[in-house]
Structures are given as C-alpha cells and as structure tokens.
Amino acid sequence: MAERTLLDQQAQGFFEELWQRGDHWEFDSSAFEQARYARLMALLAGRRYAHVLELGCGSGSFTQHLVGLAGHVVALDISPTAIARARAQWAGPATVDFRQANIMEYDLQAEGPWDLVVISDTMCYLGWLYSFFDVSWFASQIFAATRVGGYCLFANCMGEFGDMLMLPWLTRTYQSLLRNVGYHLEVEEIFRGTKYGVTIEVLISLFRKNSALDSNGAS
C-alpha cells in the first residue's frame, strides 16, 4: 500500500511539473494534434454519446471537440494545473465536468456505465509509472465501466524516434490489453503526421463492448 501511494505521488508530481511549465505537448497549438483530433472525431461521428468519460484530458483540448457528440462529459486528469487550465479555457455549456483525479485510483464504475470512454496518449505513461498488472487491471475496469453497446476510443503515438514509451510494439501491447479484457475491435487506423520535426504515427482503435449474444455470434 505504501509503495502504491508513493507511485501515485510520483505520477502526480511528474505531470504537475510538466503542466506548470505550460503546454508541454503543444496540444492547443500543434497542427499535428488538430489533424489528429479531426480524425478521431471522424471515427466517432454518426453517433450520439450521452455519457462520456475522458481519461487523461490534460488541458481539455480534445474535450472541446467531444462536446459536440456528447450529452455530458466527465474529463479527468491527475494534474491540478491542467484541470485549472481546462476549466479556464472552457466557455461552453455546463455539460463538461473537469475533475482533478488519479485515474488509476478513480472508481470508473461509480457514475457509469459510460457510452464512450476516451483514452488518448495515456496508457503509455501508465505503463511507465505503474506495474503491468496494475495497467492490465485498469484496462479491465475501463471495460467493466462501459455500457453494453458502448465504445472505447484508444489512441497513442508511436514510432522509432527515441521515446521508449512510444515504441510501436509497446503501444500495441496496450491495445491488446483492451482486446483481451473483452472489447471487440471495430476500427483500427494509423494516423501519420509530423511533430517536432519527426514523423509520428498514432495507433487509433475504436472498440465496442458487445453483449454476450453479440460476442458469441461473432465467434
């Protein structure tokens, strides 16, 4: 328990320090990020999601896009500075609830089930900060908190550009966790673009939580 508490403190300290410096990842200003958001929204288009959970929302850059398809969004991030920035930048209706929380300690099912769960560029950091068992268990909790017929949108940068957290095989390991806990993979795409002067790929996966009948029929 003491070790887990220390991990939680280290996780918050890491992200809080980055956000206190500003938009480290250039989520608000990067053309690459805006193009990525557009692609993610295109995959989600055509449906209405009444109850949406975003895990690792940062300053709310993608959250602002989600609102157009959602009835209500709960957006979580571990950094108090990121959440303060998200709230300050949000000028829309009161359908978005930005909350400071450690998603690894958050009860995902308490307000569920969710029609859509979004986890973008988050699993790679969880895999670095926490044990593989902890991340695997977290994936199972995402699935359990999703409504039957609901969706999970997973996206993560990957490439051979020196960032060990985003090695392609590692990113696909996190994708496989979501498949193994019970989701059905409906769409997989690779989005490519340039950021920081290097070519980056994004593995995008749209999962659906089928009913037991659907799953048996699919097999």
Predicted feature descriptions by range:
Residues 1-55, 59-110, 129-143, 151-219:
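Class I (Rossmann-like) S-adenosyl-L-methionine-dependent methyltransferase catalytic domain
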Residues 116-132:
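A short SAM/SAH-binding and catalytic strip from SAM-dependent methyltransferases
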